[in-house]
Amino acid sequence: MNYTNDAVALLSDMITVESFSREEKNVADMLQRYLEERGYIVSRSGNNIWLMSPGFDPERPTLLLNSHIDTVKPVAGWVRHPFTPVIENGKMYGLGSNDAGASVVSLLHAFMWLSAQPQSYNLIFAATAEEEVSGKNGIESLLRELPKIDFAIVGEPTEMHAAVAEKGLMVLDCTVYGKAGHAARNEGENAIYKALTDIEWFRTHKFDKVSELLGPVKMSVTQISAGTQHNVVPDKCSYVVDVRSNELYTNNELLSLIRQQVKAEVEARSTRLSSTATPLQHPVVKQARSLNRTIFGSPTLSDQALMPFASLKMGPGHSSRSHTADEFIHIHEIEEAIDIYIRLLDGLDIRF
């Protein structure tokens, strides 16, 4: 079987189907039909589909191959039609081609090859929803239905290098209170001035623990709002902080430390998007090194954050093409990805 041609044809079909986050039903339907027509037993939960290699044995470790089928909405500036796949000069253009359709089809066809050979592990392929919005009806909900997972490959555009660690995300809504007064008189307590002290702390503070792969925790104040009119001293100032955690702190630990240092009332929108890190001695990581894959820590978030087990983020394409006009994937990147996934995992003992 020519897996590359089949993978490219499937990606072309996927591009024609709108699959914005939380609206993935039609592309999930299409993938389900594609697999059932080829004799695979497909399971489904909402807009997530998965299949297992034959002969599942609970005594063996289980390896998950996962990528997402949702896309962002097309940005301004597209010259080509985002839902019309076009191949020009070895590139396939279309929305979701790079992020992360190429990973979906490459992992799927690697699954087909690997599951046809004897392996020392169970293999599951899952195409999941809501990754782009860190939704709760994607991989997070699906993991409750799957057997225990020992390791996962998460397909995202990394040029087929291996992200063994990933920064987490916590968004903070912060509110500082003052006292209203007339701006012409020396009265009131300016909430903006109180907030400035907090904001300077967020700008300059360095947490003690620095990760070898991910570096320091990064905090950025990204939004601020205060005041009702020019002549009233504001009694309230609200601001938003984007916190990118490393694996040496949980989000709850960081939240507690931050609350001890600032005047604002601080509420986290969520603490569930944790930083992750896989030991460099893990057999899959060691195998990736042997294939001359660069081992690195990723500053960007993926479904890896929702996986409470060892994982590696690796997929065809380049992250700089994601969420851009005229998004594309090189055809040779899909061919290379299928080959590398197979060489990475075929015959490997993933126990650690």
Residue ranges and their predicted role:
Residues 12, 32, 105-108, 112, ...:
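Predominant activation on well-ordered alpha-helical scaffold segments within soluble catalytic domains
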Residues 63-65, 126, 153, 312-314:
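Hydrophobic/aromatic beta-strand patches that form the interior of the parallel beta-sheet core
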Residues 42, 85-87, 221-224:
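A structural signal for short hydrophobic beta-strand segments in well-ordered beta-sheet cores
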Residues 36-40, 45-47, 59-60, 116-120, ...:
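Short glycine/proline-enriched coil/turn segments at helix->beta-strand junctions
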